Swiss-Prot record:
It catalyses: RNA(n) + a ribonucleoside 5'-triphosphate = RNA(n+1) + diphosphate. It holds the Pfam family RNA_pol_Rpb2_1. InterPro entries: DNA-dir_RNA_pol_bsu_ext_1_sf, DNA-dir_RNA_pol_bsu_external_1, DNA-dir_RNA_pol_su2, DNA-dir_RNAP_su2_dom, DNA-dir_RNAP_su2_hyb_sf, RNA_pol_bsu_bac, RNA_pol_bsu_CS, RNA_pol_bsu_protrusion. This is DNA-directed RNA polymerase subunit beta. CDD domains: RNA_pol_B_RPB2 (cd00653). The lineage of its organism: Bacteria, Pseudomonadati, Pseudomonadota, Betaproteobacteria, Neisseriales. The keyword Transcription applies. Gene3D superfamilies: 2.40.50.100, 2.40.50.150, 3.90.1100.10, DNA-directed RNA polymerase, beta subunit, external 1 domain, DNA-directed RNA polymerase, subunit 2, domain 6, RNA polymerase alpha subunit dimerisation domain, RNA polymerase Rpb2, domain 2. The gene is rpoB. Keywords: DNA-directed RNA polymerase, Nucleotidyltransferase, Transcription, Transferase. SUPFAM superfamilies: beta and beta-prime subunits of DNA dependent RNA-polymerase. Belongs to the RNA polymerase beta chain family. Its EC number is 2.7.7.6. GO terms for cellular component: DNA-directed RNA polymerase complex. One of its GO terms (biological process) is DNA-templated transcription.
């Protein structure tokens, strides 16, 4: 087994029992692939598929004019280069986007010609607005902030059949309904009412009988009945009435008359129920007709019009009920044969027949007019309007699109469903197999008449009791719309608006000699795109607290948003976990609160297929043997198979062991024999999301707590010094690398140069392209603000001379440690109560933890100030501010902007700004005098940017933006100069590195080669030596050497060209950078100048901060205790944190206890390794100890592949504690934890004996730090990875004396954002009244509230040392008096 450069440094001991079959896929693939498919930048113009932008253009173009003589055709589109790169866009507050240009062709036809003839073609590029580009990490920069487009889980287009579960009608009767949902266009609903009549609705409007729709489609009554019913023929004669015998219809019926065979024997007596045996006897007897009583005809419906063959008179119409009068009429007219509809109560209902009777429309046109009146009430139905509306509803590609998915879902649900034998022989089978044979193949993306009829027929068949309704929460009926598809829809809607405008102008195209760019105005397109990215419900401000929150946000799927559900209407079923979520959507990670179950996270291995359905990988099983083949199955496909779990036992050849295996089939858990198994899960963690799979021992936690654990990891604040978790799950590396927080090598090579800002790697010769200079430069991100104000800072993880492979770690980022996610710190924890300080989940923590800066985090705040052009004159950013103290002025430079590095506190001026005030406009003379004598103070007010209350920190950066045409101040100029200087240095360094690398390559390439001549009179045929090359005046003279080997000579020439190109590129880049910096900035209208100040704030851990473990065990720090008072062990080491043991049993998150035990073992092993290293033991002894650690149980590690130096480096990285991986559902067993504890704390070690372990080595004796006495019982002590969450007391709490108040109530505003106060309301007053605390109450209502005089006196009294209160009248009473007076009641308060 080969280890990468980073893995060698710290191998994580895994307890996994099963080998890794499938690597964790790239976690951001859903987002990145979806947008790449939308843009199709990689594909040549003619190779672009009908997706994304291409599909949007194709669906709108060609645009034809109203008269048909001009049309606009789309040729292809191109995307330009973005003007600014990502960091520049973030700094300037603009969108990272590229200009979109489409090549459009205007074709004008000859009006005079008899057949369509092209008269003229004009073609040019048309600017279509800007399209935001995705950053490499899957986010977008919109107006300077990083945003994420969340994928949407919506109902798939297609046809769905359901019932109301008996909730609509009081009788509990099931009312069936069907709905055809297109991708865009009108919804078509069919529904039964309690009387079993069938209705339809369009777009949830008024319902109408479904037969109106069928008539509008061109069917008459007879054809409608012919489609939906089997027939019965009755023969009328003087001897009575007979009917054709259909054996299948007799079963379960009661014989109305004796059924006799040809000899007259009774086969079934009158009044007896006909059984299956009776039917066999009747069939064997060869009977073809049965006698029936004439009365049984009454109430039956005629299948067709009955016409007198002689007179042509219509005796009865189709669907007429047979009455005695009708029978008499038949008798008179000599009718010998009548055909009726075959209807029975059981499985052939009279629904369509009854609906037809309620429908009074006659014929196709009347039906269409009725539909028009329902859709457009109040508008006159002209024939043309009626036809146009009806065709546009479902049959026009412009207004209706079922989509590829919708067509697939529709066909599988109607035409391609499996029919039972009875259905095959009924009207339904004939309809699908004969009448509509081939309809599925020719189905386009609009509805056909067959589609509508097939939907109605399937619904009627459902009501007849055949088939099952659909489960709308099944993931086969819900699909994912990712960022590419959502953007495409917005782009198409913008183009559709353009189309309407263009059609109007196309008629004038020829006469006015217009070009395509004159016709097309791209404003609607860019407006649609801007609106979507800026304010759509699915475009969200990226959660950037730590790398995990970034990854999770990009992998989120939401059922909310346009075209989705709303919180209020979503019921329990939609939110619930469904069996089809298995391996696709995480059953654990979802928000608590109103969005629970509506916002989900993709499982680790889930991906979307071409149709947008989620699929998950499975290993194929053939005849009980698990193969290496992996198939991705969607929820629809999965229902057809028997799937074993990932933890099923296998023998060495991969055969399933045991008589029965636990499997899943159609959403149920079953026990199946190995030969029935068709697939097997690929990994135990396949079910859960990334956040949930980071929780070790997840299988021992209650689901509710696991949910909290998964959610709270996303709120962990990056610590100053990240520390890898001792107990992890093995997926930490994937998250750190895929989030792009940690930098990995693009190509293998040797590290040439490292400093805090950049790492330079000289690429291996075999990975460098021939003739190209092989150098990779990694610029690191330093102290940058994230969306949540946390600090993003990358630190190099390599040193010069290190040899890297592709994919090796180059630099660590926020919350990563040696390329692994490190959200918190490993804390020594004791579970015991301590003087009530850990009551109700409070956390007692050692002062040492705070002093060592273990949980110190850096937060970066951005403060802005703008100088506007006001009516009274321009605002000015200046140092000259009226009444500013000397101390504050000293921090500002001559331009009035704070220095970098200044320590600032609340209220300090950061940027001095004055605004003109006064009513009058100044005359030019006055302006001149003011300018000469500088009388600024009188007519300006101080509107400087000050440090907000409750905030203090260090200024780390200042950026000044100035509008074009306005002179820059000195500070702005110096910022530009230093930026350019730094950039030039960077470029020079890069060139130097490229040069050195190139000449090193040349030297390796040409030394020892023969030359035909060269500088310094190099003789022909002589060999080139290192000394000769060193003796040349300049290395650039090497290019003048003429080599005999032509291939090498060509390579030398290529390198020369490449270096020249690099120099030119560097100069060009410098000029571009200079232009960007020196040209004016685009600012909002009216803004002359903008200054951004970045302040770094150090937040130490303090009481009131929220902390949590990974198992949902959260709490608030109640006290930071001096280290000497903390409980300590026998060897004098104090614990870091004391937690309440009562927080474990009721919460059922036992995973934290197992983590603590395994962490305790990890720490003990680290201490043993540390001791061995200090004693300078030999590498062999270390190797033996590490072998016991890594190869005792679980996954085996190949330590023999490491050299002695690498073993020593590995051991020194484990000094603080070993690294364990306990994968989800495949973690460490109790016996393995005990094994590790025994390895860490061997019983024969005197140090171990001193600690006073119990037998299982999970508890030790602790001593009270205050008294030095041992506690009565042994205490569970161990190591847990504990996090500090983003809910910091510094950001929650504030103090206020006076401040803003509400005009209406005259009371202070509420909340920190408004600098509000605390409201002592009605109920609080009642509480004090109930206690009889009269003086406290008086104090609360007067001197602590709005009794202004009382407050002043109280201050004076305290200063004098008199502790007394002089309470007066609170302002609230005056407000009350004023309000009563406003009612016209004069009221005065008398003072006593």
């Amino acid at each position: 087994m080969s280890y990468s450069f980073t893995e060698k440094k710290r191998i994580r001991k895994s307890f996994a029992k099963r080998e890794n079959v499938l690597e964790v896929p790239f976690l951001l693939a859903t987002q990145i692939d979806s947008y790449a498919k939308f843009l199709q930048l990689e594909n040549a113009f003619d190779k672009r598929t009908d997706d994304g932008l291409q599909a949007a253009f194709n669906s709108i173009f060609p645009i034809v004019s109203h008269n048909g003589y001009a049309r606009l055709e789309f040729v292809h589109y191109t995307l330009g280069e973005p003007l600014f790169d990502i960091p520049e866009c973030q700094l300037r507050g603009i969108t990272y986007a590229a200009p979109l240009r489409a090549r459009i062709r205007l074709v004008i036809l000859d009006k005079e010609a008899s057949k369509p003839t092209v008269k003229e073609v004009r073609e040019n590029e048309v600017y279509m607005g800007e399209i935001p580009l995705m950053t490499p990490s899957g986010s977008f920069v919109i107006n300077g902030t990083e945003r994420v487009i969340v994928s949407q889980l919506h109902r798939s287009p297609g046809v769905f059949f359901e019932h109301d579960k008996g909730k609509t009608h009081s009788s509990g009767k099931l009312l069936f309904s069907a709905r055809i949902i297109p991708y865009r266009g009108s919804w078509l609903d069919f529904e039964f009412d309690p009387k079993d009549l069938l209705y339809f609705r369009i777009d949830r409007r008024r319902k109408m009988p479904v037969t109106i729709l069928l008539k509008a489609l061109g069917y008459n009554n007879e054809q409608i009945l012919d489609i939906f019913y089997d027939k019965e023929t009755f023969y009328l004669s003087s001897n009575g009435v007979q009917t054709d015998l259909v054996a299948g219809r007799l079963k379960g019926e009661t014989a109305k008359v004796d059924i006799l065979d040809k000899e007259g024997n009774v086969l079934v007596a009158k009044g007896k129920r006909i059984t299956a045996k009776n039917i066999r006897d009747i069939t064997n007897a060869g009977l073809t007709r049965l006698d029936v009583e004439p009365e049984s005809l009454l109430g039956k419906a005629l299948a067709a019009d009955l016409i007198d063959s002689e007179t042509g008179e219509v005796l009865a119409s189709a669907n007429d009920e047979i009455t005695e009068e009708l029978l008499a009429k038949f008798d008179i007219n000599g009718v010998k044969e009548i055909t009726t509809l075959y209807i029975n109560e059981l499985d052939q209902g009279a629904y369509i027949s009854n609906t037809l009777r309620t429908d009074e429309t006659a014929g196709r046109q009347a039906a269409r007019v009725a539909i028009y009146r329902m859709m457009r009430p109040g508008e006159p139905p002209t024939e043309e309007a009626v036809e146009q509306l009806f065709n546009r509803l479902f049959f026009s590609e412009d207004s209706y699109d079922l989509s590829r998915v919708g067509r697939m879902k529709f066909n599988t649900r109607t035409y391609e469903q499996k029919l039972s034998e009875a259905q095959q022989n009924s009207w339904y089978g004939r309809l699908l197999n004969e009448t509509f044979a081939g309809a599925a193949d020719k189905g386009g993306y609009v509805l056909s008449v067959e589609d509508i009829v097939a939907s109605i027929a399937t619904l009627v068949e459902l009501r007849n009791g055949h088939g099952e309704v659909d489960d709308i929460d099944h993931l086969g009926n819900r699909r994912v719309r990712s960022v590419g598809e959502l953007t495409e829809n917005q782009f198409r809607s913008g183009l559709a608006r353009v189309e309407r405008a263009v059609k109007e102008r196309l008629n004038q195209a020829e006469s006015e000699n217009l070009m395509p760019h004159d016709l097309i105005n791209a404003k609607p397109v860019s407006a649609a795109i801007k609106e979507f990215f800026g304010s759509s419900q699915l475009s969200q401000f990226m959660d950037q607290t730590n790398p995990l929150s970034e990854v999770t946000h990009k992998r989120r799927v939401s059922a909310l948003g346009p075209g989705g559900l709303t919180r209020e209407r979503a019921g329990f079923e939609v939110r619930d976990v469904h069996p089809t979520h298995y391996g696709r959507v995480c059953p654990i990670e979802t928000p608590e609160g109103p969005n629970i179950g509506l916002i989900n996270s993709l499982s680790v291995y889930a991906r979307t297929n071409d149709y947008g359905f989620l699929e998950t990988p499975y290993r194929r099983v053939i005849d009980g043997k698990v193969t290496e083949e992996i198939d991705y199955l969607s929820a629809i496909e999965e229902g057809r198979y028997v799937i074993a779990q990932a933890n099923a036992d296998l023998d060495s050849d991969g055969n399933l062991i045991g008589d029965l295996v636990t499997c899943r089939e159609k959403g149920e858990t079953i026990m199946a024999t190995p030969d029935r198994v068709q697939y097997m899960d690929v990994a135990t963690g396949q079910v859960v999301s990334v956040a949930a799979s980071l929780i070790p021992f997840l299988e021992h936690d209650d689901a509710n707590r696991a949910l909290m654990g998964a959610n709270m990891q996303r709120q962990a604040v990056p610590c100053l010094r990240p520390e890898k978790p001792m107990v992890g799950t093995g997926i930490e590396r994937s998250v750190a690398v895929d989030s792009a927080t940690a930098i990995v090598a693009r190509r293998g090579g040797v590290v040439e140069y490292v400093d805090a800002n950049r790492v330079v790697v000289r690429v291996h010769d075999d990975e460098a392209t021939a003739g190209e200079v092989g150098v990779d430069i990694y610029n690191l991100v330093k102290f940058t603000r994230s969306n949540q104000s946390t600090n993003i800072n990358q630190r190099p993880a390599v040193k010069a001379g290190d040899v890297l492979q592709r994919g090796d770690l180059v630099a660590d980022g926020a919350s990563t440690d040696l390329g692994e996610l490190a959200l918190g710190q490993n804390m020594t924890i004791a579970f015991m109560p301590w003087n009530g300080y850990n009551y109700e989940d409070s956390i007692l923590i050692s002062e040492k933890v705070a002093a060592d800066d273990r949980y110190t985090s850096i937060h970066i705040e951005e403060l802005n100030v703008v100088a506007r052009d006001t009516k009274l004159g321009a605002e000015d950013i200046t140092r000259d501010i009226p009444n500013l103290s000397e101390r504050m002025q000293n921090r500002l430079d001559e331009s009035g902007i704070v220095y970098i590095g200044a320590e600032v506190e609340a209220g300090d001026v950061l940027v001095g700004k004055v605004t003109p005030k006064g009513e009058t406009q100044l005359t030019p003379e006055e302006k001149l005098l003011r300018a000469i004598f500088g009388e600024k103070a009188s007519d300006v007010k101080d509107t400087s940017l000050r440090m907000p209350t409750g905030m203090s920190g260090t200024v780390i950066d200042v950026q000044v933006f100035t509008r074009e045409g306005i002179q820059r101040d000195k500070r702005a100029q110096s910022i530009i100069d230093s930026e350019l200087k730094r950039y030039r240095l960077d470029l020079n360094d890069q060139l130097r590195i490229f040069d050195n690398d190139a000449f090193d390559r040349i030297e390796r390439m040409i030394v020892g080669q023969k030359a035909n001549g060269g500088p310094m009179k190099l003789a022909k045929g002589s060999e080139i030596t290192t000394e000769y090359l060193a003796g040349l005046p300049s290395r650039h003279d090497w290019f003048d050497i003429r080599l005999t080997d032509e291939d090498l000579a060509k390579q030398l020439e290529l390198i020369k060209v490449s270096l020249q190109q690099k120099r030119e590129e560097a100069d060009e880049l410098y000029e571009i950078k200079k232009k960007k910096l020196t040209q004016g900035d685009e600012l909002q209208p009216g803004v002359q100048k903008m200054v951004k100040v970045f302040i770094a704030i150090k937040r130490r851990l303090q009481a009131g901060d929220k902390m949590a473990g990974r198992h949902g065990n959260k709490g608030v720090v109640s006290r930071i205790l001096p280290v000497e008072d903390m409980p300590y062990m026998a060897d004098g080491r104090p614990v870091d944190i004391v937690l309440n043991p009562l927080g474990v049993p009721s919460r059922m998150n036992i995973g934290q206890i197992l983590e603590v035990h395994l962490g305790w073992a990890a720490k003990g092993i680290g201490e043993r390794i540390d001791r061995m290293l200090k004693e300078q033991r030999k590498a062999g002894e270390l190797r033996e100890f590490l072998n016991r650690l890594y190869n005792g149980s679980g996954k085996k590690e190949d330590l023999d592949a490491l050299t002695d130096e690498e073993i020593i480096e590995l051991a020194s990285n484990l000094r603080k504690g070993a690294s364990f991986a306990s994968p989800v559902f495949d973690g460490a067993k109790e016996s393995e934890i005990r094994e590790m504890l025994n390895l860490a704390y061997p019983s024969d070690d005197p140090e171990v004996e001193k600690l006073g372990f119990n037998d299982s080595k999970t508890q030790i004796t602790l001593y009270d730090g205050r008294s030095g006495e041992a506690f009565d019982r042994k205490v569970t002590v161990g190591v847990m990875h504990y996090l500090k969450l983003h809910h910091l007391v510094d950001e929650k709490m504030h103090a206020r004396s006076t401040g803003p108040y509400s005009l209406v109530t005259q009371q202070p505003l509420g909340g920190k954002a408004q600098f509000g106060g605390q409201r002592f309301g009605e109920m609080e007053v009642w509480a004090l009244e109930a206690y009889g605390a009269a003086y406290t109450l008086q104090e609360m209502l007067t001197v602590k509230s709005d009794d202004v005089n009382g407050r002043t006196k109280m201050y004076e009294n305290i200063v004098k040392g008199e502790h007394k209160i002089d309470a007066g009248m609170p302002e609230s009473f005056n407000v009350l008096v004023k309000e009563i007076r406003s009612l016209g009641l004069d009221i005065d308060l008398e003072r006593y």
